[in-house]
């Protein structure tokens, strides 16, 4: 019977498993895996090429070389299967068992596993409570360790040198035992009673108060508990048996010329075997201790380098002096097993070729070269040939195909029909980088690509290549067609904008056709329909741009929605339009009014047009419409015949004067600087400002001249119209080029940046049309080269950011429809510097409302909570002027191990509520990572031209209304009657008649207010002005100045300007001060009143003291009288550097890595009143007294700037010391919502600067993953340790269990982890190991006996299952359901049988799914 079963066993059923467990293998386990001991270091006989017996390739141990044939050839063929040859000892079976059968080496002396010794923190050290240094000395035979102290004063685990040992032996005789090497360590490990240790540690933890001890104990406890829980014995960290890898996994290949190519592992194994055998012999011979010891040490080193070469000491090298690749090197890094073979496999049935444009294709088609298709679809063709009877065998079919007979081409046509192929362009930065198309066979060897999908692929036709993949199975074809077909992916998943937007020629053609010209041929004619217009145009009676009146038929949605009524009805109206627009109206889809076309179609307009079409007419109509737009665009661009020549670049005549005036101004500043009125820094700042303004002015003059041209209208009057200049039209339509580039062609090139980002103050006044002289050319290349160097570096950085983001979010999938939470965040319009940066409608579009949205005027509910807010809803909300809406967010979703659809909202790439199974984590990571790469590739396009925003120096109202100040605004009135702001965080609001906020502006410290609270103002009124170049220090009190600690050469330096000879006092940096004493003092001013008394702060006993920070230029003299609101010192703002995403990418990375900034600002820990305590050396003491009267002290370095003053009320989480915010503090003091707002806004700032749109929810998804661990503060009755970080879902599950059992649940704090940390601390060890620090992750997992439940996508890809997302999620759900029902049926049958036989019923044994090892 068994033989019969074996016969069927040939086809191996794939294993079904739900989890993978990792652990340490006991020596017995290793022996049980093994098929025999490898005793000799020999590999194969160089003459016969047969493996040596008992060697590393022994056929007896590892299996036969050829299928079903023993080594000596006595037994051949299938019939002897399973026989063991008595002559050579080889089992007759498949040769591929050589890939799976392991051997082993019995070590003559135990050896420590280097991973558990050297991978930090050393696990051996933790278990034994010894330092790594000591253990190493014992293992490598430099010292003895006491095993049993006996009755001596020695302690167990004490280290002693050899001399020590011999002295002690003389002293105590054999009263005690000490050992050397791994044997000693193994005995120590065996002696440990884990349960006892855990108990003592837990009591110690409770009783100790010192932080350091708690940390140490908790760490050790964690390791010991892991051993306790997993049932792994610590002594298994010492190897007695070494497993040997199957030979096919470390092959030895004969090359021609009698040489062999071999895997490094064979060398490493050979060394181990050689040393092991020598040691065995020495032990048999009873060699002297010192020789044996040396041999044992060498064996330990050999095993070390086999496991992880180079981890300790020098790496073992081969004959060619390069380090050998050990087992650890095989799995880690980019070329290791995980990333090279498991996550990135090469794919069969694929090809690649250059792409060319295919303007005749439909959106869902691509042109596939015939030869390529023939190769890719070979198996299908063979099959068809056999079915049709053209060929009888595969071999014959192959010949047919190779000869390319006519019948083959017919079959190819047939096979390809309705069989989509996938096109991919590297780098695939987001999911639109792979799309499916229906192939159309073409001649030639290049793939044809539809022009509209280029934006999604980021492809152009300058030699890009693309890869083609064939989905083979029916399911794969179905998924490719329904989910990946190009016509189903018309929106960007990052922001929901259309991805099939026309560009370049198409835009130019459409723009040219929809422009209007004054007094063109046939102006003012009237037509009865579009066909008449076309006839007139073809007979050259009218031009495209002529203004005419046309009757146009629009198809509008039918009001009557009863059965049988048509969906659209025609509506005829007379429009004043142009010929071109009328002709275009032919392709308008049903349901769109003509008004959307009745304007010049620029790129933005076309994008909006396609968006509108998608929302109003659905996917199909949009795709058809986009295709027709493209066809028309190409045709019209050809008709337009636009070309450019040098004369199109018109240089403005007023350029000379503008540049001349600027030069004069610069001279004036130089003069002021010479006479000492301004500092060098201010002069530089001003000069740069003048030149950027000049550059703007020249650009403006040039644009004015370029953008209009004189024309005579029908009545003979001179007028101007928008220009038909080719260059202007290209830029204006958005087809190619930008205003900045035109300015460089015909205006002036302007300021250039040095590679370090600082601006060269000499601008390039010439433009490319006039030509540059040598100096100008040199300056321009200087900055431009940086762009090229940047690109290479940043692409790598951006790719790494994307990789970390994907890794942290890869297991986040939508798993249910609604988690039922009532939490959410309040969304407001994002206002910065008075500008609405992002309107409320954009922020809430596609989100689910969490509270009812109420009409503020009638108080009726507009949208109930749980409504998905779509375009119509957000427009309505905007129209009613609702300020804030509470919406669901991924951050507050209560789903465990995933997200729910309601908290996520709309799937931006599809335009409807997200489906269960969507891998929203990966999409978020792609959406954030993709523009990073895009932008880095774009830094150099403007050729390094300085794009420095002129600094704001005033703020004006954008709308009419009433000025309101926030509660934080404080100001004083100075002697001139001006109001000077002295608050740091004051804001001015403009409200409308009903009191709704229209805009808000931050008013900086030291600004002069021009409007006061309650003033009614008109749009354009200035609210406040300030000096943008310096930051003042202002006194709130009047009096006589008395300097303290202002000593020249100690705290301040006299700066004498080399040019002007004038001096100012500058506060010097603490680090540059000489003596220790001067480091702790802070230069400051006290004020004296008329009686010479110190001026006190009203209501307190504290004297007024105003400190100067580093870099301040002191403008008052000692003993000078000052009035309220006067400036005591100025702090120059730093020289501006140009910002591009170069600063941006690292900024995004540090936000997601949750790094604490270097000089972080300090936030108030409690709400209360501030006061200053006694200063200590180098620090000032700030005390906050909370509402209960408890005092909280902060010690603040003297040079830091304190934002609060005496007796000010601060709120918890408010910034009290200036500096960048620390996200960890925000989370601790202000909670998750504030943290999320901070990270989202900061990340968005970086991208917005580059004009990149990313939806907030993607960033929120990442933040959710950064918050997925919690720190246990009180463990209650749970299995956690206080201070331990655990997965939030785990903790909630455990707490639920505790509550169900009436025990105490654990309490916890939220922890913010950076993305790298979060990826490594995930519960899945497979995912973490394939990300970074493979050794450390695997070491830790093995000790803890970790179990990976294969929840994420990455783990499943690695073990080769369908991923639990999309269609795979449904598959896994169905599989689990089937298992459950099978188990129930099994129980039922068992119960019935038990009942039938009248046996006492016992619960049937459940078939468990063992976790795969």
Swiss-Prot record:
Belongs to the RNA polymerase beta' chain family. InterPro entries: DNA-dir_RpoC_beta_prime, DNA-dir_RpoC_beta_prime_bact, RNA_pol_asu, RNA_pol_N, RNA_pol_Rpb1_1, RNA_pol_Rpb1_3, RNA_pol_Rpb1_3_sf, RNA_pol_Rpb1_4. Mg(2+) binds at residues 460, 462, 464. DNA-dependent RNA polymerase catalyzes the transcription of DNA into RNA using the four ribonucleoside triphosphates as substrates. Pfam families: RNA_pol_Rpb1_1, RNA_pol_Rpb1_2, RNA_pol_Rpb1_3, RNA_pol_Rpb1_4, RNA_pol_Rpb1_5. Binds 1 Mg(2+) ion per subunit. Binds 2 Zn(2+) ions per subunit. CDD domains: RNAP_beta'_C (cd02655), RNAP_beta'_N (cd01609). One of its GO terms (molecular function) is zinc ion binding. This is DNA-directed RNA polymerase subunit beta'. It is an enzyme of class 2 (transferase). Zn(2+) 1 binds at residues 70, 72, 85, 88. The RNAP catalytic core consists of 2 alpha, 1 beta, 1 beta' and 1 omega subunit. When a sigma factor is associated with the core the holoenzyme is formed, which can initiate transcription. SUPFAM superfamilies: beta and beta-prime subunits of DNA dependent RNA-polymerase. Transmembrane segments: none annotated. Zn(2+) 2 binds at residues 819, 893, 900, 903. The gene is rpoC. Its EC number is 2.7.7.6. One of its GO terms (biological process) is DNA-templated transcription.
């Amino acid at each position: 019977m068994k033989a019969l079963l074996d016969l069927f066993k040939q086809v191996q059923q794939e294993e079904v498993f739900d989890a993978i467990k990792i652990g340490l293998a006991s020596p017995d386990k290793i022996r049980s895996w093994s098929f025999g001991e490898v005793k000799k270091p020999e590999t194969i006989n160089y003459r016969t090429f047969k493996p040596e017996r008992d060697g590393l390739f022994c056929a007896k141990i590892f299996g036969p070389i050829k299928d079903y044939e023993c080594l000596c050839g006595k037994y051949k063929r299938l019939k002897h299967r399973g026989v063991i040859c008595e002559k050579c000892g080889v089992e007759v079976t498949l040769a591929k068992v050589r890939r799976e059968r392991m051997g082993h080496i019995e070590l003559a002396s135990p050896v420590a596993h280097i991973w558990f010794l050297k991978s930090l923190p050393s696990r051996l050290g933790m278990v034994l409570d010894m330092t790594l240094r000591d253990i190493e000395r014992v293992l490598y035979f430099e010292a003895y360790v006491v095993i049993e102290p006996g009755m001596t004063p020695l302690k167990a685990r004490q280290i002693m040198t050899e001399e020590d040992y011999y002295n002690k032996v003389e002293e105590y005789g054999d009263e005690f035992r000490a050992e050397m090497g791994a044997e000693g360590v193994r005995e120590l490990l065996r002696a440990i009673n884990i349960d006892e240790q855990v108990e003592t540690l837990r009591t110690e933890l409770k009783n100790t108060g010192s932080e350091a001890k708690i940390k140490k104990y908790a760490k050790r406890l964690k390791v010991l508990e892991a051993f306790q829980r997993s049932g792994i014995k610590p002594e298994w960290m010492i190897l007695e048996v070494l497993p040997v890898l199957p030979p096919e996994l470390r092959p030895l290949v004969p090359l021609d010329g009698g040489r062999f190519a071999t895997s490094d592992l064979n060398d490493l194994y050979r060394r181990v075997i050689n040393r092991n055998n020598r040691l065995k012999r020495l032990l048999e011979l009873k060699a002297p201790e010192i020789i044996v010891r040396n041999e044992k040490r060498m064996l330990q080193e050999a095993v070390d380098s086999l496991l992880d070469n180079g981890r300790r000491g020098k790496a073992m090298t081969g004959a060619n002096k390069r380090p050998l690749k050990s087992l650890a090197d095989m799995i880690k890094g980019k070329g290791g097993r995980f990333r090279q073979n498991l996550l990135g496999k090469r794919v069969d049935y694929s090809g690649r070729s250059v792409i060319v444009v295919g303007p005749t294709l439909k959106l869902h088609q691509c042109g596939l070269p015939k030869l390529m298709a023939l190769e890719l679809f070979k198996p299908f063709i063979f099959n068809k040939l056999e079915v049709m009877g053209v060929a009888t065998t595969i071999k014959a079919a192959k010949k047919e195909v190779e000869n390319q007979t006519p019948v083959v081409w017919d079959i190819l046509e047939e096979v390809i029909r309705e069989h989509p192929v996938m096109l991919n362009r590297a780098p695939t930065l987001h999911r639109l980088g792979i799309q499916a198309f229906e192939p159309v066979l073409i001649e030639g060897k290049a793939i044809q690509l539809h022009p509209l999908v280029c934006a999604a692929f980021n492809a152009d036709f300058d030699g890009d290549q693309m890869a083609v993949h064939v989905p083979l199975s029916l399911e794969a074809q179905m998924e490719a067609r329904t989910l990946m077909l190009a016509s189903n992916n018309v929106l960007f998943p990052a922001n929901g904008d259309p991805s099939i937007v026309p560009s370049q020629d198409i835009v130019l053609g459409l723009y040219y056709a929809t422009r209007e010209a004054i007094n063109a041929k046939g102006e003012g004619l009237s037509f009865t329909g579009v066909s008449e217009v076309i006839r007139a145009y073809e007979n050259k009676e009218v031009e495209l741009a002529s203004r005419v009146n046309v009757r146009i038929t629009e198809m509008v949605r039918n009001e009557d929605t009863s059965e049988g009524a048509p969906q659209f009805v025609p509506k005829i109206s007379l429009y004043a339009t142009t010929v071109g627009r009328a002709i275009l109206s032919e392709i308008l889809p049903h349901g769109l009014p003509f008004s959307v076309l009745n304007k010049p179609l620029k790129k933005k307009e076309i994008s909006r047009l396609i968006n509108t079409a998608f929302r109003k007419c659905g996917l199909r109509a949009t795709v058809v419409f986009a295709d027709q737009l493209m066809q028309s665009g190409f045709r019209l661009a050809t008709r337009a015949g636009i070309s450019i020549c040098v004369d199109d670049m018109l240089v403005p005549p007023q350029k000379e004067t503008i540049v001349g005036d600027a030069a004069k101004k610069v001279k004036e500043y130089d003069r002021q600087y010479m006479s000492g009125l301004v500092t060098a820094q201010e002069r530089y700042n001003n000069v740069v400002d003048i030149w950027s303004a000049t550059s703007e002015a020249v650009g403006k003059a040039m644009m004015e001249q370029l953008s209009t041209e004189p024309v005579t209208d029908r009545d003979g009057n001179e007028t101007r119209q928008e220009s038909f200049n080719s260059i202007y039209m290209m830029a204006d339509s958005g087809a190619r080029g930008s205003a900045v580039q035109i300015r460089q062609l015909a205006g002036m090139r302007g300021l250039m940046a040095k590679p370090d980002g600082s601006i060269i103050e000499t601008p390039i006044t010439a433009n490319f049309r006039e030509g540059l002289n040598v100096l100008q050319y040199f300056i321009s290349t200087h900055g431009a080269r940086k762009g090229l160097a940047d690109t290479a570096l940043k692409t790598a950085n951006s790719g790494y950011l994307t990789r970390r983001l994907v890794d942290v979010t890869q297991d986040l999938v939508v798993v249910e429809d609604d988690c039922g939470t009532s939490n959410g965040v309040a969304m407001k319009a994002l206002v910065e510097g008075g500008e609405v940066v992002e309107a409320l409608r954009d922020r809430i579009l596609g989100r689910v409302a969490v509270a009812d949205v109420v009409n503020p005027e009638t108080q009726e509910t507009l949208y109930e909570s749980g409504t998905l807010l779509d375009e119509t809803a957000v427009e309505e909300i905007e129209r009613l002027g609702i300020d804030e809406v509470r919406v669901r967010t991924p951050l507050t979703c209560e789903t465990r191990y995933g997200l729910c659809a309601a908290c996520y909202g709309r799937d931006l790439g599809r335009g409807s509520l997200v489906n269960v199974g969507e891998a929203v984590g990966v999409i978020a990571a792609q959406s954030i990572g993709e523009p990073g790469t895009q932008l880095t590739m774009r830094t150099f396009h403007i050729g390094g031209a300085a794009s420095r925003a002129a600094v704001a120096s005033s703020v004006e109202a954008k709308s009419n209304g009433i000025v309101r100040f926030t509660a934080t605004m404080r100001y004083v009135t100075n002697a001139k009657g001006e109001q000077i702001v002295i608050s740091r965080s004051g804001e001015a609001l403009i409200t409308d008649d009903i009191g709704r906020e229209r805009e808000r502006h931050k008013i900086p410290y030291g600004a002069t207010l021009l409007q006061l609270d309650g003033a009614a103002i008109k749009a354009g009124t200035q609210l406040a002005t300030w000096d943008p170049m310096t930051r003042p220090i202002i006194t709130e009190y009047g009096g006589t100045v008395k300097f303290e600690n202002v000593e020249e050469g100690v705290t301040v330096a006299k700066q004498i300007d080399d040019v002007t000879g004038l001096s100012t006092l500058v506060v010097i940096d603490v680090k540059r001060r000489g003596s220790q004493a001067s480091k702790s003092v802070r230069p400051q001013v006290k004020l004296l009143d008329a009686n010479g008394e110190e001026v006190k702060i009203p209501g307190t006993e504290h004297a007024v003291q105003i400190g100067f920070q580093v870099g301040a230029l002191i403008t008052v003299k000692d003993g000078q009288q000052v009035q309220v609101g006067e400036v005591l010192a100025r702090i120059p703002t730093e020289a501006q550097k140009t910002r591009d995403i170069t600063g941006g990418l690292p900024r995004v990375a540090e936000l997601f890595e949750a790094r604490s900034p270097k000089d972080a600002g300090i936030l108030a820990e409690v709400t209360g009143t501030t006061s200053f305590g006694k200063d200590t050396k180098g620090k000032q003491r700030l005390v906050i007294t909370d509402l209960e009267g408890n005092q909280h002290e902060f010690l603040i370095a003297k040079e830091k700037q304190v934002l609060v003053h005496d007796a000010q009320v601060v709120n918890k989480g408010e910034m009290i010391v200036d500096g960048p915010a620390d996200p960890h503090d925000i989370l601790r003091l202000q909670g998750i919502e504030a943290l999320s707002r901070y990270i989202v806004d900061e990340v968005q700032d970086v991208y917005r600067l580059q004009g990149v749109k990313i939806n907030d929810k993607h960033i929120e998804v990442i933040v959710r993953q950064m918050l997925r661990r919690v720190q246990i503060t009180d463990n209650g009755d749970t299995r956690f340790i206080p201070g331990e970080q655990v997965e939030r879902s785990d903790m909630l599950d455990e707490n639920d269990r505790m509550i169900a059992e009436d025990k105490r649940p654990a309490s916890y704090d939220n922890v913010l982890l950076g993305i790298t940390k979060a990826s490594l601390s995930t519960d899945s060890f497979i995912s973490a190991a394939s990300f970074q620090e493979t050794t450390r992750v695997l070491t830790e997992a093995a000790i803890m006996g970790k179990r990976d439940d294969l929840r994420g996508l990455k783990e499943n890809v690695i073990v080769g299952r369908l991923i639990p997302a999309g269609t795979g999620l449904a598959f896994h759900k169905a599989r689990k359901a089937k298992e459950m029902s099978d188990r129930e049926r099994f129980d039922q049958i068992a119960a019935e049988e038990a009942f039938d036989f009248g046996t006492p019923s016992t619960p049937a044994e459940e078939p468990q799914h063992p976790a795969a090892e």
